[in-house]
Amino acid sequence: MQTLSLDGKIAAITGGASGIGLETARRLIAAGAIVHLLDRDRDALDSAVADLGPGAIADVVDLFDYAALQQTIDAIVARHGRIDILHANAGSYVGGKVWEGDAGRWDAMLNLNVNATFQTIRAVLPAMMRQGSGDVIVTSSIAGAIPIVAEPVYTASKHAVQAFVHTVRRQVAPHGVRVAAVLPGPVHTPLLKDWDPQRLKDEIAAGALMEPADVAEGILFMVTRRPGVIIRDLVILPHAFDV
C-alpha cells in the first residue's frame, strides 16, 4: 500500500505564508519534506516559519522580479542539490461586473495569477528535468474549468492557467516531471475579501465554503503518487456549492 511519505523531499511554495500555501506546507512537512516558503511579506513569513517549525525555511522574494525569483530557485537547488516539489500557489482574486471593473486591480491580478505563475514554473523546470523527476502543482480554481459569471476576469485568468498547465505537462512528461492543477471551489481565505460581506456570511452558514486544509490534503495526495501516475486535475468543492 502506498504511503504519504515525503522523507528527504525538497519543496517550494509561493504564497506560502498564509491560506492554502501555509496549510500545504504544514502537511508536506508532517510527511517529511523540507519546505521553502516564498513570499514578499517578511513578517508573515517569520510568523509562518515559527508556526511550522524547523522543516520550514523562509525566502523573501517578489514574484514580479523574475531575476530574483530565478536566483531564489537556484539557491534552493544549490543548497539541497535538488528540488522535488513546486506548489505555484500565489494568486489574487477580483470579482464583480466587468463594466464596474478597475483596470489597475485587473492588471495586478492577471500579473500574479498568470505571469508570475508561468515564470515560477519556468524557473524550476530545468532543475527538475536534469534530475529526471519533480512535481509542479498549480493552485487553479473551479473557475478554470467552469466559467463563473460573478468573476469573469478571474475566470479568464484561471482558464489561462489551465491551458498552460496541460501544454507544459505534455512537454515535460518525457523528462519524468509531472505538472498538474488543483481546482478548488470557494475557500475561506483572505482572497475572499472582495466578496459581499452578507454573501460570505451566508455561504459559511450554508457550508458552501471549504477551509485551506481541505485543499492541502488533496495536494499531499497528488504529490505522493508513485512515478508513472499523475492526478492531472483535482477538483475539490464544498458539498453545498452548486456550480
Task: For each feature predicted by the language model, list its residue ranges.
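Residue(s) in the substrate-gating loop at a strand-loop-helix junction
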Residues: 141
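Alpha-helical segment proximal to the catalytic Tyr-Lys
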Residues: 126, 170-171
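The beta1-alpha1 cofactor-binding region of Rossmann-like NAD(H)/NADP(H)-dependent oxidoreductases
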Residues: 42-43, 59-72, 103
